[in-house]
């Protein structure tokens, strides 16, 4: 269990508020327990939080996202047992929430070390497969011990999923994540992008359409979405960062098509 003093120290070190630190502690705690179990070899951690914790993206993230390659009945039996066990270790509870696809649960941490509740959405998708599975070690500043690997998609597959996320929901964090992945050597694989878009019946989308969608994203929306996810001292720089990131991505996609 993390202490109030540890939260305060880490918040000062990372230059974020204490809610961000406690939420990330809960994320890391959940992952450590999930991946200590055999069934987790078929549960792949993805999305913005995976990008932060596995690929070291600077921005923080709010939810936990997974692709599951288990039968739904087997998964539900496994996950509810995990929830029961976690509730014995920490003052947390889990409730299923409505979801248009897959399964969504809400992790709620009771007021304790913080004077208010903390919430994390846990999203599990069953309708797709992971094409490039990998496993990694998570190193953390939090008082959490990992004893096993974390399973996840490759950097390139995360990039393809981020393009899909941007095309289907258009959030500032997706623009940021695309830029970060490019700087880390991720490559634009249109075949993989189309495979990811197939689940939304968008596999016929063109590269030009993707570029125009990115070009049409507003600076205001980028700033509003990113403010809670970056250190306090970086928030005033988000407008300039958006201009740089937008040009960087456009130049990358333009060079790729030459």
Spans of model-derived segments:
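Structured mid-to-C-terminal alpha-helical surface segments
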Residues: 1-43, 54-57, 69-258
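Glycine-rich beta-strand-to-loop/alpha-helix junction loops that act as flexible
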Residues: 46-49
């Amino acid at each position: 269990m993390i202490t109030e003093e540890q939260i305060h120290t880490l918040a000062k070190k990372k230059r974020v508020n204490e809610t961000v630190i406690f939420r990330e502690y809960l994320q890391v705690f959940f992952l450590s327990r999930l991946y200590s179990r055999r069934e987790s070899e078929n549960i792949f951690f993805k999305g913005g939080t995976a990008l932060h914790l596995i690929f070291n993206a600077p921005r923080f993230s709010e939810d936990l996202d997974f692709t599951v390659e288990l039968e739904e009945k087997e998964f539900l039996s496994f996950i509810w047992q995990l929830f029961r066990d976690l509730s014995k270790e920490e003052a947390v509870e889990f409730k299923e929430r409505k979801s248009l696809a897959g399964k969504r649960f809400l992790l709620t941490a009771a007021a304790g070390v913080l004077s208010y509740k903390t919430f994390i959405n846990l999203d599990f998708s069953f309708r797709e497969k992971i094409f490039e599975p990998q496993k990694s070690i998570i190193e953390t500043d939090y008082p959490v011990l990992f004893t096993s690997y974390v399973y996840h998609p490759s950097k390139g597959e995360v990039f393809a999923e981020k393009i899909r996320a941007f095309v289907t929901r258009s959030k500032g964090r997706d623009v940021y994540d695309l830029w970060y992945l490019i700087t880390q050597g991720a490559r634009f694989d249109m075949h993989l992008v189309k495979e990811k878009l197939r689940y939304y019946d968008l596999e016929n989308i063109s590269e030009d359409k993707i570029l125009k969608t990115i070009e049409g994203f507003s600076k205001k929306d980028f700033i509003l979405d990113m403010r809670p996810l970056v250190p306090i001292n970086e928030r005033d720089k988000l407008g300039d960062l958006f201009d740089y990131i937008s040009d960087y991505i456009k130049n990358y996609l333009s060079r790729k098509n030459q």
